[in-house]
């Protein structure tokens, strides 16, 4: 499992990529679960959609 906690906790464009406690492991990535503010965590990276 690839945890992307660090990547998702950092801020981009002044907005947090993901809320605390929002996990983004390999299983979640397959589901392409959205994070707050339209951010998605994919391949251990925070992407804005």
UniProtKB/Swiss-Prot annotation:
- Give UniProt keywords alphabetically: Disulfide bond, Neurotoxin, Secreted, Toxin
| A Pfam family this chain is assigned to | Toxin_20
Q: Name one GO molecular function term.
A: toxin activity
Record carries keyword Cytoplasm: no
Q: Where does it reside?
A: Secreted
Q: Which GO terms describe its cellular component?
A: extracellular region
- Write out the tissue specificity statement of the associated record: Expressed by the venom gland.
Q: Which residues form the signal peptide?
A: none
- The intrachain disulfides are 4-17, 8-41, 22-24, 35-46
Q: List the SUPFAM superfamilies.
A: omega toxin-like (SSF57059)
Please give the PROSITE patterns that the UniProt record associates with this protein: HWTX_2
Q: Which domain of life is it from?
A: Eukaryota
> What does the UniProt record say this protein does?
Toxin that causes irreversible contractile paralysis into adult Aedes aegypti resulting in 100% mortality after 24 hours.
UniProt lists the family membership as follows: Belongs to the neurotoxin 12 (Hwtx-2) family. 04 (lasiotoxin) subfamily.
Record protein name field = U1-theraphotoxin-Lp1b
């Amino acid at each position: 499992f690839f945890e992307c906690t660090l990547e998702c906790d950092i801020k981009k464009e002044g907005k947090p990529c993901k809320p605390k406690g929002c996990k983004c492991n390999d299983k979640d990535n397959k589901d392409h679960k959205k994070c707050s503010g339209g951010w998605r965590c994919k391949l251990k990276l925070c992407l804005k959609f």
